[in-house]
């Protein structure tokens, strides 16, 4: 065994001072000194459990000892009588075995393949033991789940990712999918449960047993987000539901993930074979499938953007030539040819790599280089994680941990280690690029005239610019030259490395060539240079624009069309990634797909990292806003569709925020106990105003109120028990916090909850009964007007139905026409006095007479006035469809309804476009005179004369 390096020998003295007397007095072996110096995790563990060190010294870890894990664990669990005892024994067993694995790994007593096998088998042993113990306990409590024939139904667990492939790393979370075979009910229990309820409850308990931190730590962080429909899907699915999902909705990334899926525990039973046979056609196509290459290329692009987004450097997993690229290379062949070559259907990487070489799909040399690189990287990764039992793939920056890794990897020092690492990663990147890299051959650099280069390099005198700027006016020419000079001065104030300068010198002549060809060159250049100033120190973004000419062209056209987009890109340069694919840039997400897209986006973010979750929500929203605005500018989205997309996007955000807040609150307090025997959360979010009316603009805030149906006597069922209604209040406060917290990516939405009963003085969250009572007995007419444009945007079906019934009841109350007319008109006059245009000779599109608010008041008045006679008027919450209903129900002539609809959409369209230009919502007084006259006439007819 290699002696400790000089820095580690010095550190050993610090270790000695930490060791308790019994250990310090012992004559520790050289092996023990080495491992304790290398790993703080082992050090902490043996200080807490000195007997483990004695065991290690007397019974050195062996390569095949994984075969005994199940028996050892069964012995440890033999006297466990309750869930708390189960949790303690599982945690202690995991820590004890992990210390043995760390010992063997640090001292290289076994091969790296053996380490991966031991780590994976340990996880499987713990998962299966916990499942089996809980299954027996749940059967005693609720009866045994059976199918229609009375046959007991098991819970099958799919281990995904590295767990499934038998290649788990030292400190890893585990990705699981739960399934049960057939529908039915429990038998032999105190009361009957259907199988879905049984397995959902059992699954929740299993996750808690493995995942919940206690004084003994946790067993594994459990991630269930790879299951069908992710967090919004059922925790456990029947085989039939799984099959339907993967046949009808399975995505490429799910197919990719399923390659490594492995059934935990007994994998040869009837049900296990049935599940495997069901999934195989989804994963391995019967034909040779070259579409996989583009899918994996896209996924690699996503990972590269993720590396940029999270600022990852020195990452041996996700970086260029890292572990992920080796996995991609192997899985390309599995997914392309696995259906035709059963030998490629292995879950484990190294055996599959051998098959790939044997089939001559890769050269023997390339396959061997990948094998050696993989084992090198996995050993480095596992050693890195075993220092502190910490889930990281980022190389350390401190001298101690660098010295530790260099010693354990058998190098003299850190530079030698990084030199070898670079060589391995370079080999991997070469093979990856040959196989999966962009298939478009690099286009030859456009031959730019020397004048564009000179213009950028400030080598052209003003008189020399005439040939390249001839089409511009003299003032514009001067402005362009000033902008370039100012930009160069700004660069001199910033720290830009040689690579950044090189990229800029390549990019700027191309950019100037494209921008200066435009008539609006000066305006466009001013917007783009403002953006570039923000990203010049981040070379990856400059490279993106330099290497992808199409992205540069999209940037120029969008910045020319909209200063709002230019500002967004300058503020959040991560959005530049969106410019790479025009198919998605000018094609917003389908309105019904925002939730699913957001779910997939959030899969890439650790579930327990609130800061990253908040950033991801904001980044997703900004990317989607960019796409909507791009489609709006391109003319592919009419005004109604723009608002539809903005509204669906907001609803997806609300859904995700409520989900996050709910998970956080339940983790802290447990669930309100009135939910124990029912589906759902007993909670609803009601959207008012533009959100309720499907009429959101680019910068609209959200008018929300929160409802619950929690009884007065309900309590939560967690360790920190609180009153059920207090739980919902804290849930609503948490939701507001998640929306309003300002991160580096800004806030998510401004949320206004003042439309709740009693306004700002009222409770933030209201019971459904109290809301109904308030609307019937206390609400003002303007609050009933607001109810016209209200609808549930998140909530349980029963609460949604309750709200809809209350809304319908309030809106169909008989009202005295003149009184209502007076109250609505007076409220409008108050608003006009307060909000009307303060700009002389300007027309405020929303607030002034003849504007949008007048149309909204007309529709609200007519619904409240006539819904008692025509209840169908309550169906919709948006103005356009309300106007249709008014015509269909003979309240308003069709010609007038259509004219008001045209005026309304025209004015809203103008507001959207003013927002894109970052202009206020008022225009010259001589604009929209026809529309305003029409609205005034309608106002006079309904709210003055009638």
From Swiss-Prot:
The keyword Plastid does not apply. The keyword ATP-binding applies. Its cofactor is Mg(2+). Keywords: ATP-binding, Magnesium, Multifunctional enzyme, Nucleotide-binding, Nucleotidyltransferase, Transferase. Residues 1-440 are annotated as: Adenylyl removase. SUPFAM superfamilies: Nucleotidyltransferase, Nucleotidyltransferase substrate binding subunit/domain. InterPro entries: GlnE, GlnE_rpt_dom, NT_sf, PII_UdlTrfase/GS_AdlTrfase. Its EC number is 2.7.7.89, 2.7.7.42. GO terms for molecular function: [glutamate-ammonia-ligase] adenylyltransferase activity; [glutamine synthetase]-adenylyl-L-tyrosine phosphorylase activity; ATP binding; magnesium ion binding. Residues 449-946 are annotated as: Adenylyl transferase. Gene3D superfamilies: 1.20.120.1510, Beta Polymerase, domain 2, Glutamine synthase adenylyltransferase GlnE, Nucleotidyltransferases domain 2. It holds the Pfam family GlnE. One of its GO terms (biological process) is regulation of glutamine family amino acid metabolic process. It comes from the Bacteria. Belongs to the GlnE family. PANTHER family: BIFUNCTIONAL GLUTAMINE SYNTHETASE ADENYLYLTRANSFERASE_ADENYLYL-REMOVING ENZYME (PTHR30621:SF0), GLUTAMINE SYNTHETASE ADENYLYLTRANSFERASE (PTHR30621). Involved in the regulation of glutamine synthetase GlnA, a key enzyme in the process to assimilate ammonia. When cellular nitrogen levels are high, the C-terminal adenylyl transferase (AT) inactivates GlnA by covalent transfer of an adenylyl group from ATP to specific tyrosine residue of GlnA, thus reducing its activity. Conversely, when nitrogen levels are low, the N-terminal adenylyl removase (AR) activates GlnA by removing the adenylyl group by phosphorolysis, increasing its activity. This is Bifunctional glutamine synthetase adenylyltransferase/adenylyl-removing enzyme. It comes from Shigella boydii serotype 18 (strain CDC 3083-94 / BS512).
């Amino acid at each position: 065994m290699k002696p400790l390096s000089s820095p580690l020998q010095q550190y050993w003295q610090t270790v000695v001072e930490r060791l308790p007397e019994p250990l310090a007095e012992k004559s520790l072996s050289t092996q023990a000194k080495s491992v304790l110096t290398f790993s703080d995790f082992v050090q902490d563990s043996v200080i807490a459990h000195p007997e483990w060190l004695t065991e290690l010294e007397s019974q050195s870890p062996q390569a095949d000892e994984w075969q005994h894990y199940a028996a050892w664990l069964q012995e440890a669990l033999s006297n466990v009588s309750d869930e708390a005892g189960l949790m303690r024994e599982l945690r202690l067993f995991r820590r004890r075995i992990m210390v043995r694995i760390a010992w063997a790994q640090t001292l290289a007593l076994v091969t790296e393949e053996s380490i991966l096998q031991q780590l994976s088998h340990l996880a499987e042993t713990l998962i299966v033991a916990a499942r089996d113990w809980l299954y027996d306990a749940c059967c005693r409590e609720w009866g045994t789940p059976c199918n229609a024939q009375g046959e007991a139904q098991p819970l099958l667990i799919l281990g995904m990712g590295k767990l499934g492939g038998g290649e788990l790393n030292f400190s890893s979370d585990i990705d699981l999918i739960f399934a049960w075979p057939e529908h039915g009910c429990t038998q032999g229990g105190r009361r009957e449960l259907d199988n879905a309820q049984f397995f959902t409850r059992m699954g929740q308990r299993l996750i808690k047993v493995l995942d919940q931190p206690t004084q003994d730590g946790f067993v594994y962080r459990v991630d269930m987000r790879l299951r069908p429909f992710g967090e919004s899907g059922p925790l456990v699915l029947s085989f039939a539901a799984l099959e339907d999902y993967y046949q009808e909705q399975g995505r490429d990334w799910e197919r990719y993930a399923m390659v490594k899926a492995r059934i935990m525990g007994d994998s040869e039973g009837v049900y296990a074979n049935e599940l495997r046979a069901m999934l195989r056609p989804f994963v391995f196509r019967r034909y040779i499938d070259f579409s996989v290459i583009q899918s994996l290329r896209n996924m690699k692009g996503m990972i590269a953007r993720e590396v940029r987004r999270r600022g990852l450097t020195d990452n041996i997993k996700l970086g260029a030539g890292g572990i992920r690229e080796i996995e991609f290379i192997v899985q390309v062949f599995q997914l392309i040819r696995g259906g035709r070559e059963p030998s490629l259907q292995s879950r484990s990487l190294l055996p599959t790599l051998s098959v790939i070489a044997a089939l001559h799909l890769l050269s023997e040399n390339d396959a061997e280089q990948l094998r050696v690189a993989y084992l090198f990287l996995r050993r480095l990764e596992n050693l890195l994680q075993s220092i502190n039992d910490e889930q990281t793939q980022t190389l350390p920056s401190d001298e101690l941990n660098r010295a530790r890794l260099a010693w354990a990897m058998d190098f003299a020092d850190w530079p030698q280690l990084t030199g070898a690492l670079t060589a391995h990663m370079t080999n991997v990147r070469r093979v990856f690029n040959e196989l999966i890299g962009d298939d478009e051959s690099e286009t030859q650099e456009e031959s730019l005239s020397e004048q564009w280069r000179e213009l950028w390099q400030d080598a052209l005198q003003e008189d020399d610019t005439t040939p390249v700027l001839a089409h511009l006016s003299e003032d514009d020419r001067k402005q362009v030259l000033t902008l370039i000079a100012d930009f160069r001065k700004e660069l001199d104030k910033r720290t830009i490395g040689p690579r950044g300068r090189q990229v800029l010198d390549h990019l700027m002549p191309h950019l100037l060539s494209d921008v200066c060809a435009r008539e609006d060159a000066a305006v466009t250049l001013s917007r783009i240079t403002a953006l570039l100033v923000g990203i010049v120190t981040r070379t990856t973004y400059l490279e993106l624009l330099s290497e992808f000419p199409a992205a540069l062209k999209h940037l120029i056209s969008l910045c020319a069309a909209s200063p709002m987009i230019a500002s967004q890109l300058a503020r959040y340069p991560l959005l530049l990634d969106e410019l790479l694919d025009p198919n998605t840039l000018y094609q917003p997400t389908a309105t019904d797909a925002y939730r699913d897209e957001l779910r997939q986006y959030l899969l890439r973010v650790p579930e327990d990292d609130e800061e990253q979750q908040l950033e991801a929500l904001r980044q997703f929203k900004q990317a989607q806003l960019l796409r909507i605005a791009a489609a709006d500018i391109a003319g592919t989205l009419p005004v109604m569709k723009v608002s539809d997309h903005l509204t669906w996007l907001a609803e997806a955000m609300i859904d995700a925020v409520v989900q996050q807040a709910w998970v956080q609150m339940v983790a802290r307090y447990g669930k309100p106990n009135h939910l124990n025997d029912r589906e759902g959360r007993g909670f609803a979010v009601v959207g008012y105003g533009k959100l309720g009316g499907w009429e959101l603009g680019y910068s609209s805030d959200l008018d929300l109120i929160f409802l619950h149906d929690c009884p007065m006597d309900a309590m939560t069922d967690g360790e920190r028990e609180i009153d059920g209604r207090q739980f919902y209040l804290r849930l609503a406060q948490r939701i507001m916090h998640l929306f309003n917290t300002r991160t580096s990516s800004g806030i998510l939405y401004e949320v206004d909850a003042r439309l709740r009963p009693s306004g700002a003085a009222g409770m933030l969250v209201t019971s459904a009964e109290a809301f109904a009572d308030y609307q019937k007995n206390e609400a003002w007419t303007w609050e009933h007007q607001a109810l016209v444009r209200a609808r549930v945007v998140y909530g349980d079906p029963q609460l949604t139905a309750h709200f809809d019934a209350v809304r319908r009841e309030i809106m169909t109350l008989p009202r005295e026409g003149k009184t209502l007319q007076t109250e609505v008109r007076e409220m409008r006059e108050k608003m006009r006095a307060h909000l009307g245009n303060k700009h002389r000779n300007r027309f405020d599109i929303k607030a002034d007479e003849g504007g949008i608010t007048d149309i909204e008041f007309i529709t609200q008045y007519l619904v409240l006035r006539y819904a008692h006679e025509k209840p169908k008027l309550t169906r919709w919450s948006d103005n356009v469809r309300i106007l249709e209903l008014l015509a269909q129900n003979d309240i308003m002539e069709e010609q007038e309804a259509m004219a008001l609809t045209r005026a309304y959409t025209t004015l809203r369209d103008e507001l959207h476009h003013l927002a894109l230009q970052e202009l206020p919502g008022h225009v010259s007084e001589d604009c929209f005179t026809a529309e305003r006259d029409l609205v005034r006439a309608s106002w006079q007819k309904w709210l003055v004369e009638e």
